[in-house]
Each structure stands twice: as structure tokens, then as C-alpha cells.
UniProtKB/Swiss-Prot annotation:
<dbReference type="InterPro" id="IPR037652">
    <property type="entry name" value="Mim2"/>
</dbReference>
<feature type="topological domain" description="Mitochondrial intermembrane">
    <location>
        <begin position="72"/>
        <end position="87"/>
    </location>
</feature>
<keyword id="KW-1133">Transmembrane helix</keyword>
<keyword id="KW-0496">Mitochondrion</keyword>
<dbReference type="GO" id="GO:0140595">
    <property type="term" value="C:MIM complex"/>
</dbReference>
<protein>
    <recommendedName>
        <fullName>Mitochondrial import protein 2</fullName>
    </recommendedName>
</protein>
<feature type="topological domain" description="Cytoplasmic">
    <location>
        <begin position="1"/>
        <end position="53"/>
    </location>
</feature>
<comment type="function">
    <text>Component of the MIM complex required for outer membrane protein import. Involved in import of the subset of proteins with multiple alpha-helical transmembrane segments, including UGO1, TOM20 and FZO1.</text>
</comment>
<keyword id="KW-0472">Membrane</keyword>
<comment type="subunit">
    <text>Component of the MIM complex containing at least MIM1 and MIM2. Interacts with MIM1; interaction is direct.</text>
</comment>
<feature type="transmembrane region" description="Helical">
    <location>
        <begin position="54"/>
        <end position="71"/>
    </location>
</feature>
<dbReference type="GO" id="GO:0005741">
    <property type="term" value="C:mitochondrial outer membrane"/>
</dbReference>
<keyword id="KW-1000">Mitochondrion outer membrane</keyword>
<dbReference type="GO" id="GO:0070096">
    <property type="term" value="P:mitochondrial outer membrane translocase complex assembly"/>
</dbReference>
<keyword id="KW-0812">Transmembrane</keyword>
<dbReference type="GO" id="GO:0045040">
    <property type="term" value="P:protein insertion into mitochondrial outer membrane"/>
</dbReference>
<dbReference type="Pfam" id="PF19117">
    <property type="entry name" value="Mim2"/>
</dbReference>
């Protein structure tokens, strides 16, 4: 699933680069427009990398800790009910 998302992002980036190159060849973009589009593309890439890092943090750190906490709490509750019932 992540591979298809990465592939689509790469293809979108290639399409953007191709469209910018086509405009440069036609003389529609100046150097300022090109540098601005490059800066925007870099900012977009950094934003996507940040989102991926946050996603990994959530999936690999926070969710397991939350599951561990909830699991221990549930086990304590069930064990106390079990003991009360049989003791």
C-alpha cells in the first residue's frame, strides 16, 4: 500500500517537472518563476516527508504504547472480576 502511494507521489512529481520544463522551452517561465516553482516543490517534498515521519511515529511508537496500556488495564479489570467471582 505504501509502495503505491510512493509511486503516485513520484509520478506526480515527474509530471510537474515535465510541465515546468515544457513551459520553460516555450519561453513562458522566467528564472524567478522557475526558482519559485522549485522552492514550492521542495517545500511540498519536505511536507510529505514530515507527514510520513509523523505517520511512522504514530504507528510504531504511540499506538503500541496505547495498546499496551489498554491491554494491561483490561487484564487487571478482568482478573479482579475473575477473582471476585471464584473467591
Amino acid at each position: 500500500m505504501a509502495d503505491s502511494e510512493d509511486t503516485s507521489v513520484i509520478l506526480q512529481g515527474i509530471d510537474t517537472i515535465n510541465s515546468v520544463e515544457g513551459l520553460e522551452e516555450d519561453g513562458y517561465l522566467s528564472d524567478e518563476d522557475t526558482s519559485l516553482s522549485n522552492e514550492l516543490a521542495d517545500a511540498q517534498r519536505q511536507w510529505e516527508e514530515s507527514l510520513q515521519q509523523l505517520n511512522k511515529l504514530l504507528n510504531w511508537v504511540l499506538l503500541p504504547l496505547l495498546g499496551k496500556y489498554i491491554g494491561r488495564r483490561m487484564a487487571k479489570t478482568l482478573w479482579s472480576r475473575f477473582i471476585e467471582h471464584f473467591v
